Amino acid sequence: KADEHGNVVKFKARLVALGYDMRKDEYKETYAPVARWTTLMIMIVLGWYYLMDIYLLDFKGAYLHSTRPTSTPVYLYDIPGIKTPPDKMIYLNKGLYGTLDAGNLWRQTVEKLLLSNGYTQAINDPCLFYKTRTINGKTYKTYIATWVDDLLIVSNDPETKNMKKDFEEKGFEISHFDKINKYLGVNVNYDKEKDILTFDQCDYIDEILQNANM
C-alpha cells in the first residue's frame, strides 16, 4: 500500500473468494454506487468557503464488517492451511472480498451505520449524507460522502473529531482518520487558517513520466 506520495509503506495479504464461481442463488444485488465526482468537489469547495474542517476516514477491511443474509447462504471450499472435518464445510456469514455481492453488502452496512447515527441520506446522490444540530443557538453541519471504504467528511462540528472513536466502539476498524491532503489520486492543499485551497495531480504526472522513462 502506498502513501499520499506514492511510496510503498506496507504490504498486504488478503483472502479473496473466487466470485465468478458463485451461483445465482448465492447472491442478490451486486451494484454498489459511489459518490459523484461533482458531489465530492462541491463538498470540498463548500468546506473551504465556509471554513469547515475536511477529513478522510478509511475503514480497514471494510467488506469484512458486513453480514451476509441467511437467504443466500454461501459455503467455501477448504482453504489451504485450514483443516475442516470430512463431513463439514465452511459457512460464510460475513462479507468477503471477491464475492459478487461484497460491495453491495458493504454499501448497506455503511448506510445503516450513518443513518443510525442521525444522518439523512440525500435524494440526488445516495452516497451523500448530512446532519445538522443546534447547540446554544449555534448550528453545526456535517456532510459525509462514501466512496467504497473511504468517507469524505466536511464539518464545522467539533464532535467530528471523535468519529473514529465512535465507529471503533461500534466494532469497526479504522486505518486512517486525518485532515485531507490527497483524495482519489488528487492532491488537495487545504489550509483553513490561510484560506487556501488548491488541487493538483503532480504525483500522477511524475508517475507517468517515470513509466515513460522521461
What are these regions (language model features)?
Residues K1-M214:
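Long, low-complexity, charge-biased intrinsically disordered regions
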